[in-house]
Amino acid sequence: MTATLERREGVSLWERFCAWITSTENRLYIGWFGCLMFPTLLTATSCYIIAFIAAPPVDIDGIREPVAGSLLYGNNIISGAVIPSSNAIGMHFYPIWEAASIDEWLYNGGPYQLIVLHFLLGVASYMGREWELSYRLGMRPWIFVAFSAPVAAASAVFLVYPIGQGSFSDGMPLGISGTFNFMLVFQAEHNILMHPFHMAGVAGVFGGSLFSAMHGSLVTSSLIRETTENESTNYGYKFGQEEETYNIVAAHGYFGRLIFQYASFNNSRALHFFLAAWPVVGIWLTAMGVSTMAFNLNGFNFNQSVVDSQGRVINTWADIINRADLGMEVMHERNAHNFPLDLASGDVLPVALNAPAVNG
């Protein structure tokens, strides 16, 4: 008998690194997308925390009137924000090395671009990492598809909208009250409440909340009893058990009688796909709506659409909304322009009949 011993070649450092990066045995899966996700999200988070606490005021409108957003400059958690980059910068890429000094970079709102661009790269990489881990485990890719909805929404308000409006100063501020201000100004300038894609998004969010509550309460109400009255019902479930933990037939019968028969799902897989798809499609549509309104394809305008026989306008709810929009538009960026565009878009009145002679 002859035994042949083959000498095993040493595994290179790169191969070991690749095996570690793509291993599903790690407590936290890294993956190739993780190589981009971790540094970008850490950078965005670190810069956001520092800027929210200590960033100096930013000349957001580009008119030498800085706006303070950080805690050390008088704000609190509610009013604080990372202020968007200056309108003087517009859509120019503005990294630190493009500024003459750190003070100039801070004054023009450089941290906003740094945070937003790293954040968008990070969440896109997180989405890719979800697909990558699903692929390694032999799972279907629907987790990654579902997460594409919030990624699309974030991209719409932080990147697509500034591109459409021509300036990062029109992006959403990174704070609570700044978000609300962005929403009010967006309504004033684009009438988003009258845009059908926004309506679909509202239906997606509120409908998703309703369906989630209905599903959770139905399942909790139809659990198969495995414990006594003196024990928590949660002890009746063992992680990884093969048996159903609730009676879907009972839940189906209850809901079918409560509403009507065909309002209730009799297929658990179809039910859970619906629970995932409804809010995801709604958020997709909202992101598409914001992205189109970024280029001023705005919501429906039904202003002064009802008149009497004499031609006098009979105000409808659309006219009430329009008046509110004009009020909000007048109030924002109060020193950047004298009138909102809607009020300044009438016929041009001549102010000089003859041009003055210019002596060269």
Swiss-Prot record:
Its main location: plastid. Its EC number is 1.10.3.9. The record marks 344-345 as: Cleavage. Tyr-161 forms a radical intermediate that is referred to as redox-active TyrZ, YZ or Y-Z. The record marks 161 as: Tyrosine radical intermediate. A quinone binds at residues 215, 264-265. Fe cation binds at residues 215, 272. It is found in: Plastid, Chloroplast thylakoid membrane. Pfam families: Photo_RC (PF00124). The record marks 190 as: Stabilizes free radical intermediate. Chlorophyll a ChlzD1 binds at residue 118. Residues 345-360 form a propeptide. InterPro entries: D1/D2 (IPR055266), Photo_II_D1/D2_sf (IPR036854), Photo_RC_L/M (IPR000484), Photo_RC_L/M_CS (IPR055265), PSII_D1 (IPR005867). GO terms for cellular component: chloroplast thylakoid membrane; photosystem II. It comes from the Eukaryota. PROSITE patterns: REACTION_CENTER (PS00244). Chlorophyll a PD1 binds at residue 198. Pheophytin a binds at residue 126. It catalyses: 2 a plastoquinone + 4 hnu + 2 H2O = 2 a plastoquinol + O2. GO terms for biological process: photosynthetic electron transport in photosystem II; response to herbicide. Keywords: Calcium, Chlorophyll, Chloroplast, Chromophore, Electron transport, Herbicide resistance, Iron, Magnesium, Manganese, Membrane, Metal-binding, Oxidoreductase, Photosynthesis, Photosystem II, Plastid, Thylakoid, Transmembrane, Transmembrane helix, Transport. The chain crosses the membrane at residues 29-46, 118-133, 142-156, 197-218, 274-288. PSII is composed of 1 copy each of membrane proteins PsbA, PsbB, PsbC, PsbD, PsbE, PsbF, PsbH, PsbI, PsbJ, PsbK, PsbL, PsbM, PsbT, PsbX, PsbY, PsbZ, Psb30/Ycf12, at least 3 peripheral proteins of the oxygen-evolving complex and a large number of cofactors. It forms dimeric complexes. Photosystem II (PSII) is a light-driven water:plastoquinone oxidoreductase that uses light energy to abstract electrons from H(2)O, generating O(2) and a proton gradient subsequently used for ATP formation. It consists of a core antenna complex that captures photons, and an electron transfer chain that converts photonic excitation into a charge separation. The D1/D2 (PsbA/PsbD) reaction center heterodimer binds P680, the primary electron donor of PSII as well as several subsequent electron acceptors. 2 of the reaction center chlorophylls (ChlD1 and ChlD2) are entirely coordinated by water. This is Photosystem II protein D1. It comes from Trieres chinensis (Marine centric diatom). The gene is psbA.
